[in-house]
A protein has these predicted regions:
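Sec-dependent N-terminal signal peptides of Gram-positive bacterial secreted proteins and lipoproteins
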Residues: 2-26, 332-351
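N-terminal edge beta-strand
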Residues: 29-57, 194
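Short, solvent-exposed loop/turn segments enriched in Ser/Thr/Gly
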Residues: 54-61, 123-126, 138-144, 199-203
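Short solvent-exposed strand-capping/beta-turn motif centered on an Asx-Ser/Thr pair
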Residues: 65-70, 81-83, 135, 208-214
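Terminal connector regions
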Residues: 72-94, 131-179, 260-317
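Intrinsically disordered, low-complexity Pro/Gly/Ser/Thr-rich segments with frequent PxxP/GP/PP motifs
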Residues: 97-136, 227-261
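Membrane-proximal extracellular "stem/stalk" segments
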Residues: 180-188, 192-329
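Cytoplasmic C-terminal tails of single-pass
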Residues: 355-390
Length: 390
């Protein structure tokens, strides 16, 4: 089994994008990436942040440099920005489904060769074709361009058939907008349901950003209380989350390791703060006891039900939940008892039937025996009568 750890690099630090640091050393790569920023670039960031006219087409340039004495093949791919379960924006390809509100997917408006071959100790410019939609709109089309060395997986360790491999990649963010108009943020709560994260039971609250703008500096307070069982209460507070434009993600509320999900009715209460501002009208006390001011606040309340079969299924897969030995499960004992009773009842019916058949056979034998005795007596009488006549 392979465990791939994606390391996202080359996304610069800016409040509209977030912070992604270089977590691997340069010697992990056999090539370097340098975006050539065009004249319509907004700001001095190290990624593409373009202002374009409706319908405008443009070719971007990214310089790749092979720093080794061997040929390096680099795979290239474009992806739309998404939000992962940790409340972090991802710019690289992943399995997260596009949100229903995403009207302009970057994949449909940008293209790049699938791969490029870099000769030893050489540089090469890669061209990226981008086109702005013809319709006028406010907001941003967000995504990223990923560069990964082909077959670049590096095995760290092997043990009993398990190989842990790291896959390193450069990711250059690509933002496209028609103007600098601010998009008023919005946040919706779509659904609440039990699920699992890393084979541990959680209750997922799906949050959706339906607008074409980033939701930045999000602080979330969430609590799930049992309505069927008032003793049940689970909390999950997180700070400094971010959501990509037109995206959604599952915010997990852990029920704690070793705890079983219980069937019944529940209520989720959630408060989300967004965009720090010292003059903001909404106050949040952070984990350090310090007051934080925000421009936006959303409050959600939603009731939901966990079915018994759903709870049982998830509990059986939770690696932290102690599994009840079969001999301690009263349902198994009840089942065995019912089977024994059924077998006893069946045996009793068969025994009664067989006994009845035997009694009927004995009765027939007695009747036959009586008939034979009667015939014998009749014959004997007839013989005696004949002797008298003689």
């Amino acid at each position: 089994m392979k465990i791939y750890q994606k390391v996202l690099l080359f996304v610069a630090t800016i409040f509209t994008i977030g912070t992604v640091s270089k977590e691997v050393h340069a010697n992990e790569f056999n090539f370097s990436v340098n975006p050539v920023l065009p004249e319509n670039q907004i700001g001095e960031s190290g990624y593409f942040n373009l202002q374009m006219s409706p319908g405008q087409s443009q070719t971007l340039t990214i310089s790749l440099k092979n720093t080794t004495d061997k040929t390096v093949v680099v795979e290239e791919e474009i992806a739309s920005a998404t939000t992962n379960i940790n409340g972090v924006v991802e710019y690289s390809p992943n399995k997260i489904k596009a949100d229903s509100t995403l009207k302009y997917n970057l994949v449909d408006y940008a293209s790049i060769p699938k791969e490029v071959s870099l000769q030893p100790n050489s540089s090469q410019q890669v061209k990226v074709s981008v086109t702005m939609p013809k319709e006028n709109f406010n907001g941003v089309i967000a995504g990223g361009i990923t560069f990964k060395e082909k077959d670049s997986e590096k095995t760290n360790s092997k043990s009993k058939g398990l190989s842990i491999q790291n896959k390193y990649a450069y990711v250059v963010a690509l933002l496209m907008k028609q103007n600098k108009n601010t998009v008023a943020p919005d946040l919706k709560l779509n659904s609440v349901e039990p699920s699992q994260v890393n084979y541990r039971n959680v209750i997922n609250a799906n949050l959706q950003n339906p607008k074409a703008g980033y939701l930045n500096q999000m602080y979330v307070q969430a609590e799930v209380k049992g309505l069927s069982n008032s003793k049940l209460s689970y909390k999950a507070n997180k700070e400094m989350l971010q959501m990509a434009p037109n995206s959604n993600f599952d915010y997990p509320v852990s029920i704690g390791d070793g705890n079983k999900l219980e069937a019944g009715k529940y209520r989720l209460s959630m408060t989300v703060y967004g965009q720090k501002n010292n003059d903001g009208k909404f106050t949040y006390v952070d984990s350090k006891g310090k007051e934080q001011k925000f421009d936006y606040q959303w409050k959600f309340t939603k009731d939901f039900t966990i079915l018994g079969k759903t709870a049982s299924k998830l509990n059986s897969k939770d690696v932290t939940v102690k599994k009840t030995p079969w001999y301690e499960n009263w349902l198994i004992w009840l089942g065995l008892l019912l089977i024994l009773l059924a077998l006893f009842f069946l045996f009793f019916i068969l025994w009664k039937k067989r006994k009845k058949e035997e009694e009927e056979q004995d009765l027939e034998k007695e009747k036959l025996k009586a008939q034979l005795e009667a015939m014998r007596e009749q014959i004997s009488k007839e013989d005696n009568s004949d002797e008298t006549d003689v």
